[in-house]
Each structure stands twice: as C-alpha cells, then as structure tokens.
Amino acid sequence: MACLTLALDAMGGDFGPCVTVPASLQALASNPQLKLLLVGNPDTITPLLANADSLLLERLQVIPAEHVIASDAKPSQAIRASRGTSMRVALELVKNGEAAACVSAGNTGALMGLAKMMIKPLEGIARPALMTVIPNQRRSKTVVLDLGANVECDSTMLVQFAVMGSVMAEEVVGIVEPRVALLNIGEEENKGLDNIREAAAVLKNTPAINYIGYLEGNDLLTGKTDVMVCDGFVGNVTLKTMEGVIRMFLSLLKPSGEGSKQSWWLKLIGRWLQKRVAKRFGHLNPDQYNGACLLGLRGIVIKSHGAANQRAFAVAIEQAVQAVQRQVPERIAARLEAVLPKSD
C-alpha cells in the first residue's frame, strides 16, 4: 500500500503539542503506511520527539509555522491574519497536494472559513458542515451534522446536509437506504422553525432520501435514525451536552477511593458491576469517536475537539486516514451530482 500523508496543525487545541505530538507518534505506531507533517513551532515540537522511536521519526516531518490562531479569536479577524499560522500552513499542504488531509483541533470558525476559501466546496454545496459518526444503543452508527460550522442554516442548507449525511451513511458506514431525520423540538409536523419545516417539505419530495420526519434530542443515541440533521448551533450544544453526560456517567464507574471501609464482598460486587456496565456502555465514550469531518469540501479536513486528549486526537487522525482511504469527497460529489441541482 502506498504511503498516506496527513498534515496536522500541531499547535491547535487547548493543549497544543503536548497532546498532538504524542498522539501523532501513537498514530504512526499503529499505521505503518502513515506519514505525518507536523505543522508548528519547531522549538516547541522537537523536544517532545526526543525519546521517540527512530523508525517512527522517519515518517514524521516538522513543518515550521511561526504563528497560531487563538481559540477565542473572531473567525473573520483570524482569517485575515492567518498567513504563517499552523492551521493555514497545514491547509496549504492539502491544497498543494502535499498532504491528503488536514487535522486540526484549533478555532472552528477559522478552520471553516480557511478551508472553504482554500480547498473550496463541492459543486452544489453552499457551505460545508461538520459531521461525525457516533455509536448508538443498537450497536450501530448515527451520522450527525452540522456540529458547529454554521450557526444559522436556511432550509436549502439543511437539505444539502441531509443529502451529504445520507451519502456518508450509505457509502462510508455501509447502511443501505439510510433513514434521515431532522432534529426538532417535537415530532409533530407543525413543530419547529420555518427553515426546518421548509426543509422537511423538500425532503419529503426527494426520492433519493429516505426521510422519516422529525426526531427530538433524546433520540440521538437510540438508533431510530441513521442520519440526524440540524443547524450548527443546535448540533454543537446537543453533542457536547450528550458527551458531558456520558463522561459523567462513565466517571461514576471508576473507584471513588472512599470504599476502604467496605467489606471485601461489597468491593468485589462493585468491581464486577463496573466491568459489566463499562463493557455495555464503554463504546459511547466520546474519546472513541473524536474527529468531525468538514463535509462538502473538495478535500478532507478533520476538526478535533479543542479539549481532546492524546487518545482522542489519535482517533481524529484515524478518522482522516479512513476518509482518505474511502475517497469521501469523490463519493459525495458523485451522489450530489445526481440529487442536487447544479449552481448557476
């Protein structure tokens, strides 16, 4: 198999190289065909590679970038001042064909704007959407978009998201005739904002989409739908709320350190319950599905959580590898051409 090269914004995220560098080494160790371009400040990155395996370092290259886009910077200002930043240099590597995909945990708005400006949307797509695939209670997967790229969406954008999500569910996840739902405040047809109701009317009359109607937020993990569509504001809040609840739930399974006075048999039962529940629900751990694909571009861009740890960022790198191997942009473009009208 040919070498697969990815560009990583090593300086992005809450923890920067402290997370991205060890995660990169972890990804290289698990994928012998992978080559990584770490974009950022060499003075910060290089010391973190001092004890790395020399064989791994043969497939890793540090690309200098003097500046970093702050996580709290306004997207418009960040884009104007983006030259020489680690995020922009990483995207330029994709644009120039030196890397097959870009992974960044940096400023979401800046990443969205720069990616749209440099890599360009697919024909027929107004604005890209952040998409992830999450596990559900049926041990299957649910495609969810938008997760924050577009705070406000009109009905046309929601329809485009539905088409892209359906393509991802079918072509990448492997679901035949995936069910598509719009996230709403109720399942009744008269519920919701105008843009949601207008999108529903269009989707009902789109034969290529298996539209099943509205679903509420409490159905996100039930597996009632294969694709859940919403605007970026609702999607981001919903996903992060869900992840927070899951993290709290999983943390309750860990020993609290307060059970030293418990009898041995209570401790034994407690450990048994922890293992059983962890086995049943551990697949819902957000670290295992970190990495949202900026869907609708001519190239592949993966957005990691800003607060991602080493394990989670390594998962985002793997998401990029899979997106490249499965030729996500090409597959989406082929399906969009048959479903969506071409722009003038």
From Swiss-Prot:
<keyword id="KW-0444">Lipid biosynthesis</keyword>
<keyword id="KW-1208">Phospholipid metabolism</keyword>
<keyword id="KW-0594">Phospholipid biosynthesis</keyword>
<dbReference type="InterPro" id="IPR003664">
    <property type="entry name" value="FA_synthesis"/>
</dbReference>
<keyword id="KW-0963">Cytoplasm</keyword>
<comment type="subunit">
    <text>Homodimer. Probably interacts with PlsY.</text>
</comment>
<dbReference type="GO" id="GO:0006633">
    <property type="term" value="P:fatty acid biosynthetic process"/>
</dbReference>
<keyword id="KW-0808">Transferase</keyword>
<comment type="function">
    <text>Catalyzes the reversible formation of acyl-phosphate (acyl-PO(4)) from acyl-[acyl-carrier-protein] (acyl-ACP). This enzyme utilizes acyl-ACP as fatty acyl donor, but not acyl-CoA.</text>
</comment>
<dbReference type="GO" id="GO:0008654">
    <property type="term" value="P:phospholipid biosynthetic process"/>
</dbReference>
<dbReference type="GO" id="GO:0043811">
    <property type="term" value="F:phosphate:acyl-[acyl carrier protein] acyltransferase activity"/>
</dbReference>
<dbReference type="Pfam" id="PF02504">
    <property type="entry name" value="FA_synthesis"/>
</dbReference>
<keyword id="KW-0443">Lipid metabolism</keyword>
<dbReference type="InterPro" id="IPR012281">
    <property type="entry name" value="Phospholipid_synth_PlsX-like"/>
</dbReference>
<protein>
    <recommendedName>
        <fullName>Phosphate acyltransferase</fullName>
        <ecNumber>2.3.1.274</ecNumber>
    </recommendedName>
</protein>
<comment type="similarity">
    <text>Belongs to the PlsX family.</text>
</comment>
<dbReference type="GO" id="GO:0005737">
    <property type="term" value="C:cytoplasm"/>
</dbReference>
<comment type="pathway">
    <text>Lipid metabolism; phospholipid metabolism.</text>
</comment>
